[in-house]
């Protein structure tokens, strides 16, 4: 995973509607072209890093990249959970993401409860790791200062 940190941005699109409704863990979804342009050596799995919506504040996040085996998805997706409570949905806004580390491979779960428990564990682990000085400095990266009108993959 020599591509980490990896920076990308794209417009938030509607996903399957499962994050908030079934899991109680809202996610922002990237369009297919952002997922399709991920470097080949960023394998599927759960990652952590920083995210902002538009030119808003930068928050901790976890992101799932892959097919979500529990739901048997047929299309690869990139679903970001930002550790912040937003007042309203932000479909159509630009999501800026800096992936800084890898937590675990994606895997199937035998129940919705075990999936939720794993995600909650991922969130807690990401919160800890993002306090490391080498990860905190990425929160201040110029990537997050770019105007809303610039949409690009990479840095």
Swiss-Prot record:
- Assembly description: Monomer. Directly interacts with TNFRSF1A death domain. TNFRSF1A-binding may be supported by TRADD. In the absence of TNFRSF1A, interacts with TRADD. Independently of TNFRSF1A, interacts with the NADPH oxidase subunit CYBA.
What the entry lists under InterPro entries is as follows: Riboflavin_kinase, Riboflavin_kinase_bac/euk, Riboflavin_kinase_dom_sf
GO BP terms, alphabetized: apoptotic process; flavin adenine dinucleotide biosynthetic process; FMN biosynthetic process; positive regulation of NAD(P)H oxidase activity; reactive oxygen species metabolic process; riboflavin biosynthetic process; riboflavin metabolic process
Cofactor stoichiometry and binding remark:
Zinc or magnesium.
Molecular functions (GO terms): ATP binding; metal ion binding; riboflavin kinase activity
Report whether Transmembrane shows up as a keyword of the record: no
The protein here is known as Riboflavin kinase
Q: Which reaction does it catalyse?
A: riboflavin + ATP = FMN + ADP + H(+)
Function field: Catalyzes the phosphorylation of riboflavin (vitamin B2) to form flavin-mononucleotide (FMN), hence rate-limiting enzyme in the synthesis of FAD. Essential for TNF-induced reactive oxygen species (ROS) production. Through its interaction with both TNFRSF1A and CYBA, physically and functionally couples TNFRSF1A to NADPH oxidase. TNF-activation of RFK may enhance the incorporation of FAD in NADPH oxidase, a critical step for the assembly and activation of NADPH oxidase.
Transmembrane stretches, by residue range?
A: none
What pathway or pathways are given for this protein in its record? Cofactor biosynthesis; FMN biosynthesis; FMN from riboflavin (ATP route): step 1/1
Instruction: Write out the residues that bind ATP.
Output: 15, 21, 27, 29, 82, 84, 91
